[in-house]
């Protein structure tokens, strides 16, 4: 989003107290999401992105109804919209957390618009914590990735959806594993372009060249700050805010 919309001020909230979301119940994730959205509305955000596939997968009306006027977007619908354009008669693989895969949301949304496609999903729960710990482009990460992708359920796929916002950081390694034989679909750029188009449509784009980003977490740790700096490629400082008293 910061690359596609460089003039926008970003307020990021990472719920580090409850990581990983992929292991939490639907009800717990919905409760956390509602409180975070309320916090972002109080910060006068003009648009809110649920930048997590696990949270997006289980977001229900109670989550979206937190705001009557602020648009709330998930990271699943824009990707599904793009996949539907190319889905006919293809085998589409999906990898993500247990919560995302267990929800079956990608299968149901894609199949509802493209009944001829074959959607195969695989939970890959070790990938997100591996990335958070900084194991990227190393022997360990390559081994873990290869073990998951070699699973027989993913055999003969034509496209692979990276259904976790962490996974773009290992896109290169996944591409290298497939050696061009599979089209790896990175959600990050798709979602960012969708948000940019929506802001433009609503005349909400910011054209100022002076931007200010704020990064909040529910539980500060030095390791997550280091991880966040790796994600954003800048020297950022995290501010702890306890929303869950």
Where are these regions (language model features)?
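Non-catalytic structural scaffold of enzyme domains
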Residues: 1-245
């Amino acid at each position: 989003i910061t690359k596609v919309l460089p003039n926008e001020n970003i307020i990021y909230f990472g719920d580090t107290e409850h990581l990983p979301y992929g292991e939490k119940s639907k009800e717990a994730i919905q409760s956390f999401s509602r409180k975070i959205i309320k916090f972002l509305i109080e910060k006068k955000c003009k648009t809110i992105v649920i930048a997590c596939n696990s949270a997006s997968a289980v977001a229900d009306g109670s989550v979206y109804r937190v705001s009557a006027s602020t648009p709330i977007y998930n990271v699943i619908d824009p990707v599904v919209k793009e996949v539907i354009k190319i889905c006919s008669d293809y085998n589409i693989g999906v990898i993500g957390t247990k919560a995302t895969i267990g929800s079956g949301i990608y299968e149901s949304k894609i199949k509802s618009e493209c009944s001829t496609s074959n959607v195969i999903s695989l939970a890959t729960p070790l990938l997100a914590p591996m990335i958070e710990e900084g194991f990227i482009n190393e022997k360990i990460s390559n081994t873990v990735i290869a073990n998951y992708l070699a699973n027989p359920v993913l055999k003969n796929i034509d496209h692979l959806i990276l259904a976790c916002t962490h996974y773009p950081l290992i896109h290169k390694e996944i591409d290298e594993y497939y050696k061009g034989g599979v089209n790896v679909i990175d959600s990050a750029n798709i979602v960012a372009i969708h948000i940019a188009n929506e802001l433009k449509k609503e005349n909400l784009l910011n054209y100022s060249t002076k931007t200010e980003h704020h990064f909040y977490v529910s539980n500060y740790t030095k390791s997550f700050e280091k991880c966040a700096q790796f994600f954003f490629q800048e020297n950022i400082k995290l501010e702890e805010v306890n929303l869950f008293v």
